[in-house]
């Protein structure tokens, strides 16, 4: 709950200053980690860094919702998601490379420099987008609307299904006797497919509409994740194809899921829209924790080749909530506010 709390505390600042402040604090946390020589110091540094990481993504998403042109809103969200995806895919191997050449703590100093640079660019290039001061009680308003908290579940379950597989993908590939070189190449294809998927998801939502796009992408995600479990017993090429498919369709859901949060906030909690968007973004992080936990249970009790089926079940739950919960509520709400033709 760090991101919603900090968002309320800094809501009196304009969005440019909010983003610059959180980036600076994120950089300072990594500087502290670099110079830390105790477990307590490292723990404090990582705690601050974790808080700021969530807030940065939330602020970027809110800016997209409030200030991007309506026709380009999905693409703006896709670009934010691409930054997040690229950082995940490139950051780990880059950090390993830097730590091997310059020492274990050097990646933290590199991250601090990049974060300070981003903060400076924010101050000198971003307009002063105004922000409405928020209150802690506004966070509770979001949970009073069933479609809104159903949206939280869709976000957590959909994104969680990706991480059931993602966290233990290397274990699966090693069990299937892939060499380290082949695993590295598969991860490269995984990253490329994820990046293309993010762009595709945003474009599809613009062309076909939010609900049609998200329903299609979740369906394809379920099929791709389920195929991963069956591919364990088939050829290696089939497994590689299923990994690429799950990467593409799993990450393609990001932009439509973010759009879903904004749409539900605007429709059901218009007076506390920013707070609802914040909580919707937090649901994605909860999904990461949920997916990692479910994936670990699957590996321990069933075997890593069952992770795909477990992930598909989470995505199926998200699709059912979207279809039989949120869509009905949204259509009912729209029919009430629609003008009469009689």
Stretches with model-predicted labels:
Residues 14, 35-41, 52, 231-233:
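Helix-breaking motifs and short loop linkers at transmembrane-helix boundaries and internal kinks
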Residues 212-257:
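C-terminal transmembrane helical hairpin of 12-TM major facilitator-type secondary transporters
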Residues 264-301:
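A late C-terminal transmembrane helix in Major Facilitator Superfamily
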Residues 1-37:
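Conserved MFS/SLC helix-loop-helix module at the cytosolic interface between two early adjacent transmembrane helices
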Residues 29-32, 40-49, 237-245:
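Paired small-residue
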Residues 148-198:
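Extracytoplasmic gate region of multi-pass secondary transporters
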Residues 39, 45-83:
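Cytoplasmic helix-loop-helix junction between adjacent transmembrane helices
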Residues 55-68, 252-268:
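Intracellular juxtamembrane helix-capping segments at the cytosolic ends
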